[in-house]
């Protein structure tokens, strides 16, 4: 039986989807390995926990857990400005938080794994604190002088780190990293990365750039990427941003992101029912925090809806659209239904244009589609013809099977 590979991420709640994309990319390319994922964060929502648990259900080779970190001490060390948050500093604590582990792999959450990580994991770290890839961008701008490093000193990109946790604990490196970050908070431009390179100087092992191929590399052809194991989307513009310039790299990210979206589809009905319950409870209790939470979850669901989501009632577009229409008709949320549901309506129509009714299936496809259209038409003032009333009576009798009524 193969040993388990522990892999760490350090993120905030806003980055969970990107982290999950990274996780899925690992698992799709390393199904024969035993992997334990550890997520270091200051908070995690119920929906994020459910998404991580669903990933566990899909991939049998992985266990996923999260560790809640007290962020206050790290916030004081965060340099003002920039797009990098204090959560990246959580990696300092890995060795001391997990004394049962002697070795681990740390990954930033803005990367994808496009091959086997087993050769990387098996690298010998004897005599080294960590291993990483030479940072090409830093070499180009001659940044070492600012950090008082010589040209012979190694400077790595800290987005991919193979860690010798045993030696990091023994030599109390966490304490030294925190102290360095505090002292040089105004000098060090890349904070935790600078601290790691300075404190671990002389004990950093260089590894091939196939394990941390950054956007500083200038060639982004499919042929160039065929041998790359880890693609790291450095910089403030990411592949999920519309203005991201490198199409080949963006397509690779979208490939793995589509996998996580399919897993997320399995949770849509549960999230919609919870949204309705939260809005109902907030109305009864006048609790604004509950209402804000429900509104945030509703926006999360709407943002996820696209023609790629199944048209089904259960965990699909019709069920989500029906739930939102119900919220509007019960005045649990305010707004124009045509405007709010435009995105879902468009997605539903797009699927209908591409597929026949027989392709959709009766129970999960056509019946859900009919119920969604019925409920949408109920919002119209003139929806009171004899035929319409018969349809209303029919669906009212079947209402319990649609969970909402």
Predicted features by range, described:
Residues 339-364:
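Asp-box/WD-like beta-propeller blade repeats and closely related beta-sheet repeat scaffolds
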Residues 226, 262-314:
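Internal amphipathic alpha-helical repeat/solenoid segments
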Residues 111-146:
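Conserved donor-nucleotide/metal-binding helix-loop-beta segment in metal-dependent transferases, i.e.
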Residues 55-97:
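Active-site-proximal specificity loops/subdomain of glycosyltransferases
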Residues 274-287, 321-333, 369-382, 405:
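Well-ordered alpha-helical scaffold segments within catalytic/enzyme domains
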Residues 1-11, 21, 163-264:
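A glycosyltransferase accessory/donor-loop signature
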Residues 25-33:
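Short, acidic, metal-binding catalytic loop of nucleotide-sugar glycosyltransferases
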Residues 104:
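Short aromatic/hydrophobic "clamp" motif used to bind/position activated sugar donors
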């Amino acid at each position: 039986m193969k040993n388990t590979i522990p892999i760490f991420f350090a993120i905030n709640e806003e980055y969970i989807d990107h982290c999950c994309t990274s996780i899925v990319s690992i698992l799709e390319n390393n199904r024969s390995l035993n992997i334990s994922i550890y997520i270091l964060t200051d908070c995690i929502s119920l929906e994020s926990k459910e998404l991580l648990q669903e990933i566990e259900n899909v991939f049998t080779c992985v266990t996923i857990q999260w560790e809640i970190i007290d962020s206050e001490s790290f916030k004081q060390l965060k340099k003002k400005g920039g797009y990098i948050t204090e959560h990246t500093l959580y990696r300092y604590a890995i060795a001391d938080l997990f004394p049962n582990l002697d070795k681990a792999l740390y990954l930033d959450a803005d990367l994808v794994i496009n091959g086997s990580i087993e050769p990387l994991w098996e690298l010998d770290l004897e005599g080294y604190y960590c291993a990483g890839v030479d940072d090409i961008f830093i070499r180009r701008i001659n940044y070492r002088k600012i950090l008082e490093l010589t040209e012979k000193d190694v400077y790595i990109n800290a987005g991919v780190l193979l860690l010798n946790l045993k030696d990091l604990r023994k030599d109390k490196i966490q304490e030294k990293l925190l102290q360095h970050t505090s002292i040089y908070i105004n000098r060090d431009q890349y904070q935790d990365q600078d601290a790691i390179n300075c404190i671990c100087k002389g004990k950093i092992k260089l590894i091939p750039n196939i394990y941390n191929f950054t956007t500083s590399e200038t060639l982004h052809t499919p042929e160039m990427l065929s041998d790359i194991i880890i693609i790291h989307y450095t910089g403030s513009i990411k592949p999920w941003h519309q203005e991201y310039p490198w199409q080949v790299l963006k397509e690779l990210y979208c490939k793995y992101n589509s996998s996580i979206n399919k897993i997320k589809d399995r949770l849509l009905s549960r999230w919609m029912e919870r949204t309705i319950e939260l809005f109902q409870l907030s109305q009864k209790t006048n609790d604004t925090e509950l209402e804000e939470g429900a509104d945030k979850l509703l926006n999360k669901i709407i943002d996820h809806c696209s023609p790629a989501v199944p048209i089904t009632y259960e965990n699909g577009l019709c069920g989500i659209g029906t739930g939102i229409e119900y919220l509007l008709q019960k005045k649990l949320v305010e707004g124009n239904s045509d405007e709010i549901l435009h995105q879902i309506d468009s997605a539903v129509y797009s699927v209908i244009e591409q597929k026949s009714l027989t392709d959709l299936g009766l129970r999960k496809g056509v019946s859900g589609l009919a119920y969604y259209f019925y409920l949408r038409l109920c919002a119209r003032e003139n929806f009171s013809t004899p035929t319409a009333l018969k349809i209303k009576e029919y669906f009212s009798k079947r209402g319990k099977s649609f969970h909402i009524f």
